[in-house]
Amino acid sequence: MALWQQGQKLYLPPTPVSKVLCSETYVQRKSIFYHAETERLLTVGHPYYQVTVGDKTVPKVSANQFRVFKIQLPDPNQFALPDRTVHNPSKERLVWAVIGVQVSRGQPLGGTVTGHPTFNALLDAENVNRKVTAQTTDDRKQTGLDAKQQQILLLGCTPAEGEYWTTARPCVTDRLENGACPPLELKNKHIEDGDMMEIGFGAADFKTLNASKSDLPLDIQNEICLYPDYLKMAEDAAGNSMFFFARKEQVYVRHIWTRGGSEKEAPSKDFYLKNGRGEETLKIPSVHFGSPSGSLVSTDNQIFNRPYWLFRAQGMNNGIAWNNLLFLTVGDNTRGTNLSISVAADGNALSEYDTGKFNLYHRHMEEYKLAFILELCSVEITAQTLSHLQGLMPSVLQNWEIGVQPPASSILEDTYRYIESPATKCASNVIPPKEDPYAGLKFWSIDLKEKLSLDLDQFPLGRRFLAQQGAGCSTVRKRAVATRNSSKPAKRKKIKA
């Protein structure tokens, strides 16, 4: 007989995880496809910062910024369908599913150059041709560099998540002195249009971590540099923030420099020997950093200007655009050419070169075009499906105007005619206006409500989709008309030998 020994641990089975259904289990595809595309989308601005001109503002348009497109699709439940038999409004609701997407970019390729006129680069740490034993009160230098090369394409029906490091609140027992290094924590935020990408200096909140105003290039000086939180979005139970993504990052260290300043965490004497003069402390900081470089820009490694077909998403949402919304997050600094514009200060043509007689301006331009292939789908209104959507995304049921019917009241209620008049009482039970959950966020809004078409063969992406299905552009071939002679040919007579 087996006996339970004293002190032996009892391992219980883990708590079962609440399952999230894949969208394919309750979404029926109708095999009706639409094409949607935008016009040529253009934006122009200053590549480093925002400029105020009179009562107007020149926006900041940098190649190192994210472009986040909020795409509004038409409501398919109010759509004029070619076949009324495909939809039963009393038993199902229609939704859109993304089948294909193409982000086209114009403008020539060019490296993204950034910099700072007073950059904190004390010494060149990779070339040991001279020895500097002390630093002055101001050793900042004019510095320029090409940023880390990045291409990002990310599609979902909710905004993408970004991560960054920032200062954290210290513990009560850890009272920080003035000038001490603050604790750090990793935070998340939605990636908005105009947020800065990580360009080789780390994903961090440089508004709080850059007191010298000289440690970074101008375009990220007072910004939060974000890096897409692929780990968090991949673990999202709903799978709404990232259907799929494509990315390419490229960087190498061009120069190695030393920062200037008072190093409070200098290496101790256990790491080096003192010199003959008895000096035991280092006078040059040991804070080294690398100058990033994106290197060669080529058409061989472009992720744009090509179609992407979504057969199976990485999450549980297989491309369903809930609430008729899509969020397309794009980052691309391979077309980072900035225009240097010189204008005569007095408006007259210059006859000789004089730096005081012309004004300099800086501009960056971007060009986009978006195209989508959408499939019409339906969701059957059942108790299981509604319960699942209520726990997953309640706003879907609110937009479908599906809710619990309250019981009929037996109390006689009052209805005022002029309820907004000062002569009557204040209105009660007023339905609040519908709020946009993304009202406080900044996106490039694109309205495609009137830009859907069933004629796929009339658009480049539509023709590529038809080719994937084995159906190309077919033309009516004219058959050759066979001419017949009314007179029958005479039969040959056989002659016996």
Swiss-Prot record:
Source organism, top-level taxon: Viruses
Entry GO MF terms: structural molecule activity
Keywords attached to this entry: Capsid protein, Disulfide bond, Host nucleus, Host-virus interaction, Late protein, T=7 icosahedral capsid protein, Viral attachment to host cell, Viral penetration into host cytoplasm, Virion, Virus endocytosis by host, Virus entry into host cell
Subcellular location: Virion; Host nucleus
Cellular compartments per GO CC: host cell nucleus; T=7 icosahedral viral capsid
Assembly information from the UniProt record: Self-assembles into homopentamers. The capsid has an icosahedral symmetry and consists of 72 capsomers, with each capsomer being a pentamer of L1. Interacts with the minor capsid protein L2; this interaction is necessary for viral genome encapsidation. Interacts with protein E2; this interaction enhances E2-dependent replication and transcription activation.
Taxonomic lineage of the native organism: Viruses, Monodnaviria, Shotokuvirae, Cossaviricota, Papovaviricetes
Protein function: Forms an icosahedral capsid with a T=7 symmetry and a 50 nm diameter. The capsid is composed of 72 pentamers linked to each other by disulfide bonds and associated with L2 proteins. Binds to heparan sulfate proteoglycans on cell surface of basal layer keratinocytes to provide initial virion attachment. This binding mediates a conformational change in the virus capsid that facilitates efficient infection. The virion enters the host cell via endocytosis. During virus trafficking, L1 protein dissociates from the viral DNA and the genomic DNA is released to the host nucleus.
Residues annotated as transmembrane: none
Alphabetized Pfam families for the sequence: Late_protein_L1 (PF00500)
Major subcellular location class: virion
Statement: the UniProt record of this protein carries the keyword Disulfide bond: yes
GO BP annotation list: endocytosis involved in viral entry into host cell; virion attachment to host cell
Family: Belongs to the papillomaviridae L1 protein family.
Coiled-coil stretches: none
InterPro entries named among the record's database cross-references: Capsid_L1_Papillomavir, Capsid_L1_sf_Papillomavir, dsDNA_vir_gr_I_capsid
UniProt protein name: Major capsid protein L1
